[in-house]
Curated annotation (Swiss-Prot):
It comes from Bungarus multicinctus (Many-banded krait). Its main location: secreted. It is found in: Secreted. Its cofactor is Ca(2+). This is Basic phospholipase A2 beta-bungarotoxin A7 chain. Keywords: Calcium, Disulfide bond, Hydrolase, Lipid degradation, Lipid metabolism, Metal-binding, Neurotoxin, Presynaptic neurotoxin, Secreted, Signal, Toxin.
Amino acid sequence: AVCVSLLGAANIPPHPLNLINFMEMIRYTIPCEKTWGEYADYGCYCGAGGSGRPIDALDRCCYVHDNCYGEAEKIPGCNPKTKTYSYKLTKRTIICYGAAGTCGRIVCDCDRTAALCFGNSEYIEGHKNIDTKRHCR
Protein backbone atom coordinates (compact mmCIF):
# COMPACT_ATOMS: atom_id res chain seq x y z
CA ALA A 1 0.00 0.00 0.00
CA VAL A 2 1.12 3.54 -0.67
CA CYS A 3 0.56 6.18 1.99
CA VAL A 4 0.20 9.81 0.99
CA SER A 5 0.94 12.38 3.67
CA LEU A 6 -1.06 15.57 3.74
CA LEU A 7 1.10 16.88 6.57
CA GLY A 8 2.51 19.68 4.45
CA ALA A 9 -0.98 20.93 3.63
CA ALA A 10 -2.18 20.86 7.23
CA ASN A 11 -2.13 23.79 9.59
CA ILE A 12 0.27 22.28 12.09
CA PRO A 13 2.22 24.39 14.58
CA PRO A 14 6.02 24.11 14.51
CA HIS A 15 7.55 21.28 16.55
CA PRO A 16 10.97 20.91 18.13
CA LEU A 17 13.37 19.78 15.41
CA ASN A 18 13.83 16.22 16.62
CA LEU A 19 10.10 15.59 16.66
CA ILE A 20 10.04 16.08 12.89
CA ASN A 21 12.52 13.19 12.55
CA PHE A 22 10.52 11.08 15.01
CA MET A 23 7.22 11.82 13.22
CA GLU A 24 8.72 10.74 9.90
CA MET A 25 9.90 7.47 11.47
CA ILE A 26 6.45 6.86 12.96
CA ARG A 27 4.70 7.51 9.63
CA TYR A 28 7.07 5.00 8.01
CA THR A 29 6.21 2.18 10.44
CA ILE A 30 2.51 2.55 11.26
CA PRO A 31 -0.49 1.43 9.19
CA CYS A 32 -1.48 3.81 6.37
CA GLU A 33 -4.89 4.56 7.89
CA LYS A 34 -3.27 6.01 11.03
CA THR A 35 -1.54 9.36 11.46
CA TRP A 36 1.35 10.11 13.81
CA GLY A 37 -0.98 12.46 15.72
CA GLU A 38 -3.14 9.53 16.82
CA TYR A 39 -0.18 8.36 18.88
CA ALA A 40 0.30 11.72 20.62
CA ASP A 41 -2.38 11.24 23.30
CA TYR A 42 -2.60 7.51 23.79
CA GLY A 43 -2.50 5.55 27.02
CA CYS A 44 -0.51 6.76 30.00
CA TYR A 45 2.80 7.54 28.26
CA CYS A 46 2.26 8.48 24.61
CA GLY A 47 2.32 12.27 24.58
CA ALA A 48 3.47 14.78 27.16
CA GLY A 49 4.38 13.41 30.55
CA GLY A 50 3.46 9.99 31.80
CA SER A 51 2.63 8.19 35.01
CA GLY A 52 1.51 4.87 36.39
CA ARG A 53 1.74 1.58 34.58
CA PRO A 54 1.55 1.35 30.76
CA ILE A 55 -1.91 0.08 29.78
CA ASP A 56 -0.88 -2.03 26.76
CA ALA A 57 2.00 -2.91 24.44
CA LEU A 58 1.75 0.34 22.46
CA ASP A 59 1.78 2.44 25.63
CA ARG A 60 4.80 0.41 26.77
CA CYS A 61 6.60 1.55 23.59
CA CYS A 62 6.12 5.14 24.77
CA TYR A 63 7.16 4.29 28.33
CA VAL A 64 10.42 2.77 27.05
CA HIS A 65 10.92 5.79 24.75
CA ASP A 66 10.47 8.21 27.67
CA ASN A 67 13.04 6.28 29.71
CA CYS A 68 15.42 6.19 26.76
CA TYR A 69 15.21 9.98 26.44
CA GLY A 70 15.87 10.18 30.19
CA GLU A 71 19.10 8.23 29.70
CA ALA A 72 20.11 10.47 26.78
CA GLU A 73 19.58 13.56 28.96
CA LYS A 74 22.35 12.29 31.26
CA ILE A 75 24.85 13.15 28.51
CA PRO A 76 26.01 16.75 29.15
CA GLY A 77 24.29 19.11 26.70
CA CYS A 78 22.06 16.42 25.19
CA ASN A 79 18.44 17.50 24.72
CA PRO A 80 16.58 14.67 22.97
CA LYS A 81 13.64 16.88 21.99
CA THR A 82 15.77 19.25 19.95
CA LYS A 83 18.71 17.06 18.89
CA THR A 84 18.64 16.27 15.18
CA TYR A 85 20.37 13.23 13.75
CA SER A 86 21.03 11.34 10.53
CA TYR A 87 19.00 8.28 9.58
CA LYS A 88 17.65 6.41 6.59
CA LEU A 89 14.27 4.76 6.02
CA THR A 90 14.85 1.69 3.88
CA LYS A 91 13.49 -1.80 3.25
CA ARG A 92 10.93 -1.67 6.08
CA THR A 93 13.51 -0.65 8.66
CA ILE A 94 15.29 2.44 9.99
CA ILE A 95 19.06 2.88 10.04
CA CYS A 96 20.64 5.40 12.44
CA TYR A 97 23.99 6.97 11.57
CA GLY A 98 26.63 8.53 13.78
CA ALA A 99 29.16 7.32 16.30
CA ALA A 100 27.86 4.97 18.98
CA GLY A 101 27.42 6.67 22.34
CA THR A 102 26.96 10.18 20.94
CA CYS A 103 23.85 12.19 21.79
CA GLY A 104 22.52 12.14 18.23
CA ARG A 105 22.99 8.40 17.80
CA ILE A 106 21.40 7.58 21.15
CA VAL A 107 18.38 9.81 20.44
CA CYS A 108 18.03 8.32 16.96
CA ASP A 109 18.15 4.81 18.44
CA CYS A 110 15.46 5.81 21.00
CA ASP A 111 13.19 7.10 18.23
CA ARG A 112 13.93 4.16 15.92
CA THR A 113 13.12 1.61 18.61
CA ALA A 114 9.87 3.40 19.50
CA ALA A 115 8.74 3.80 15.88
CA LEU A 116 9.37 0.12 15.10
CA CYS A 117 7.58 -0.82 18.32
CA PHE A 118 4.56 1.30 17.27
CA GLY A 119 4.47 -0.53 13.96
CA ASN A 120 4.41 -3.90 15.72
CA SER A 121 1.84 -3.02 18.42
CA GLU A 122 -1.94 -3.07 18.28
CA TYR A 123 -3.64 0.34 18.38
CA ILE A 124 -6.72 0.13 20.61
CA GLU A 125 -9.11 3.03 19.91
CA GLY A 126 -10.42 2.97 23.48
CA HIS A 127 -6.95 3.83 24.81
CA LYS A 128 -6.81 7.19 22.99
CA ASN A 129 -7.55 10.30 25.07
CA ILE A 130 -8.11 8.30 28.25
CA ASP A 131 -8.67 9.90 31.64
CA THR A 132 -5.09 9.63 32.86
CA LYS A 133 -5.99 10.66 36.42
CA ARG A 134 -8.20 7.59 36.63
CA HIS A 135 -6.31 5.02 34.57
CA CYS A 136 -2.65 5.94 35.09
CA ARG A 137 -1.88 5.54 38.77
